[in-house]
Amino acid sequence: MKHKYLIAVSGGPDSMALLNKKRHLVEAVCHVNYHDREDSDNDEKIVRDYCKKYNLKLFVFDTHKDDVSKYKDINNLQTWYREIRYDFFEKISQELGIKKILIAHQKNDFLESAYMSLNKNKKNLFLGIRRKSKFRSLILIRPLLNKTKKSLEQYCRSKNIEFVIDYTNFWDRYSRNVVRKMMAEWDKKTFQKFYLKVKWFNLKNMFFIKLLDSKFNNWIKQDFDINYFLKIKNNYKESLIYLFLNHIGIKPNENKIEQIIEFINKNKNGSVKKYRLKENQFIEIKNKKILYSIC
């Protein structure tokens, strides 16, 4: 189905603006009701009303009605949200045969992510959020990365599009919210200066990133053959494992990346020993291939 997308819509100004801008390209709308706020049903109503008005197909995952038992061992709330959300998106993607999904991350989200990465002193090749990326079997597309949150709210008001403001975005219990509140106090000059710093950083690394993406795509085509990986120069290996983890839907961190490289080096002769990624998810090496499994 050419030029048709899924779209993730929360009911907030960012996703409602994106939906209104791209609805002619949308095959189906995906909404998750986490029931994490007293008024979360209002978010769903806003999305339902819009979809009804424009005759758009809507799929809703409701954590009070749908089965969430498989997530009971997840202790981190943000991880719980993410696993539910992307499992749901994948399910709808497979049902409709559409891999591309529009996500409403915007310029503020981009800079918040960049700031948090810099503060963690991580070995960064790219700061912020990519316009296009792969996650599990999905292709995520983010058309709003050059739009500020304020401009999207103004757009919704100018078009009389109803939206909801999630007050939990201002709670200090999440590190991103602390960064968000700090950046909200920046003047335009400070905001733009940091934005240009991030863009310049990414531009300097663009050649390496493109080369890395090419190598990773070749590795996918070879079904994650370990001989291909072992022949790669060491300065690419950490980044390839980062992309591998992201590809299978596991949040990467430096310790996990180092441990997986060590696991591959120790088991390159085809040991059936497994490496535990998290809970019931593992990788193992069989027939010189890295296999991912859920037990």
Swiss-Prot record:
An individual GO BP term: tRNA modification
Record keyword Nucleotide-binding present: yes
Recorded catalytic activity of this chain's protein: cytidine(34) in tRNA(Ile2) + L-lysine + ATP = lysidine(34) in tRNA(Ile2) + AMP + diphosphate + H(+)
Alphabetically ordered keywords of this record: ATP-binding, Cytoplasm, Ligase, Nucleotide-binding, tRNA processing
Coiled-coil stretches noted in the UniProt entry, renumbered to this chain: none
A single cellular component GO annotation: cytoplasm
Subcellular location: Cytoplasm
KW Nucleus (keyword) present: no
Domain of life: Bacteria
GO MF term set: ATP binding; tRNA(Ile)-lysidine synthase activity
EC number: 6.3.4.19
Main location: cytoplasm
Positions annotated to bind ATP: S10, G11, G12, P13, D14, S15
Function field: Ligates lysine onto the cytidine present at position 34 of the AUA codon-specific tRNA(Ile) that contains the anticodon CAU, in an ATP-dependent manner. Cytidine is converted to lysidine, thus changing the amino acid specificity of the tRNA from methionine to isoleucine.
HAMAP family registered for this protein in UniProt: tRNA_Ile_lys_synt
Domain comment in the entry: The N-terminal region contains the highly conserved SGGXDS motif, predicted to be a P-loop motif involved in ATP binding.
Family as reported in the entry's similarity comment: Belongs to the tRNA(Ile)-lysidine synthase family.
Official protein name in the record: tRNA(Ile)-lysidine synthase
